[in-house]
Amino acid sequence: MKKIIGVFSSLLIFGLAAAQARMQNAPPEDELILKARQFLEALNNNDFQAAVRDFDQTMMRVSGPDKLAEFWKQVPGMFGAFKKQAAARREELGPYSIALVTCEFEKVTMDARVVFDKNKKIAGFQFIPSLPPAKYEPPQYANPDFFEEKEIVIGSDDWQLPGTLTIPKGEGPFPALVLVHGSGPNDRDETIGPNKPFKDIAWGLASHNIAVLRYEKRTRVYGPKIMVDKTIAVSFTVKEESVDDAVDAVRLLQATAGIDTKRIFVLGHSLGGMLIPRIAEAGQDLGIAGFIIMAGLTRPLEDAYVKQISYLVSLDGAISEEDKKQIDEAKAQSEKIKALKEADAASEMKILNASPKYWLDLRGYDPAVAALKISRPVLVLQGSRDYQVTTEDFENWKKALRPRENAAFKLYPKLNHLFFEGQGMPTPNEYAQIHGSVAEYVIIDIAAWIKKN
């Protein structure tokens, strides 16, 4: 299986950020499903002019024939050769209609998610894991009798984000934790396949008398707005993607009854962990009590991207010529990022579906070194079986922060990127297609650290 998720899911997806949608069965001859099938057939035939025939203006601008061809070249390395289209279904998302066509590749089955606007033009496209709808199965350590959940909204008028506050029952005040997503248009639960790691953490910690705030990511709720507005698209960086909303979440908790305002913590996972130093800096006047870095990347994103591609194409034990091309393409994209100049900051071009300013903003950013400026306690957590953010990153955090008396480190031998247990070579199957939960001992360690601080 050669599916890339997590750190780079947002960089390899064309089009609209997904949101919670209402699913319904569609008749076989549904017009939009037929359009989606024709689009996929054109892709498979490498007829990219035909593929973009139904693109709306925004998609044509950001993902025209050349960029679509560039994307399609990466697909065999991720999924194997395309075999056939299978079943299809429909979703409705506000003004959009979504056709999902199951596609069988040589090494994995994926759903092609083709988004149509009210004029039946294609407004977005992405591949997502093909999974049957799964009911959330809470981990055994979560006790719903101990807490309640409240719907909240964070952010300004232009960027309001719905979320959930999971708060223990009782008078309080309770310590609280804000959860900050990894990359990609994540929902509040960081849902991937049948799994919801952020919900595991929220329910698990609330069972230990710790309140948890989680929210929809900005790129999930406002994906179309970010794409269509040129000013926003060109200037969009990790500040807008993650940092600002994490700080707003802390402010909301400070104004919430039942919360111990002197004991509000922030946890960042994956990209969120990488950005903890920036969140700490942006919220330095808020008195945040401490920070937790879960599988936080320390290396440049483009370097980790090449490593991920190389790992994924090697999972079957052989490197084919197509695999080599995939690795070479990844290296070429990485080199494009490294070759960017400050003069490119206002350009509308995209590299790995992110603007030059996005990449330039991260140039020279060393999260581990930046973390030295954090005066509050820091806890770094890492799974040894994580191929996306590796023990190399963990050692970088450790090397930089080890002299600090208020820094703590935990390395878990059996855990993957989502802090689920597994054995052998880690693959995306472990969390994209197999039900799992954040390990209970991780919840216990986080709870103990928060209560200690």
Residue ranges, per PLM feature:
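Primarily recognizes the serine-hydrolase "nucleophile elbow" in alpha/beta-hydrolase
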Residues: 248-312
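N-terminal cap/lid segment of alpha/beta-hydrolase-fold proteins
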Residues: 132-172
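Short solvent-exposed beta->alpha transition segments
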Residues: 33-34, 49-94
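Alpha/beta-hydrolase active-site loop
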Residues: 234-256
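Cap/lid segment of the alpha/beta-hydrolase catalytic domain
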Residues: 180-241, 310-313, 421-432
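Catalytic active-site module of serine/aspartate enzymes centered on a nucleophile-bearing elbow/loop
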Residues: 418, 424-453
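Accessory cap/linker subdomain of secreted extracellular hydrolases
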Residues: 285-373
